[in-house]
Amino acid sequence: MLRLALASREEAGLAALADTIRAGGVAVLPTDTLYGFSARYDHPAAIARIAALKGRADSAPFLLLIGDRRALALLTAEPPPAAALDGIWPGPVTLLLRARPDLPPLLRGAAGTVAVRWPRDRRLTALIAAIGVPIMSTSVNRQGERPLDDPDLIAGAFGAAIDVLADGGVLAGGQASTIIDLTADPPALVRAGAARVDLERLARLVRPRGSES
């Protein structure tokens, strides 16, 4: 396992992370909420490795992280209006959107949805840009256990099974993202988390065409 400290902003470290993930490796990355197992979204073998690491017995889909709005076209055929995303992204808000049918099964929910977030952390968005495609992310823990927020504990528990660990220090007080279902009418709060969202405003902005009175 390669371990990279993120205290410095060396471009070499970012390049090494990007190269590993781009080649199909499994990484652990600090996000603006929690540490996450990550891999490129279009590499089913790497995603399956992560599912095995977590010991997942369910089929709940993994989260996808993007670095800009343009990446939505790779994940959903029905991207929300740009105005609806203002004030929400970038930030700790996960949106459930209608998934493209060609996404791997581990990224699609049973109802045909995909969970997407544009994180606020600039190093993370720079990494996603360097990789060139969205990445999947899921908390660093085995199913039913508490997510790990200390890189030393992560290295001890999973170091032999991952390719690279980006060490951003202990993420004290990390809180999971807020989840909003934009496929519901009106948009619905699925999980309260690190951000508050004005659902009434959001409903006005994403209201389907022809629904105006």
PLM features per residue range, with description:
Residues 1-213:
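Active-site-adjacent structural elements in enzyme catalytic cores
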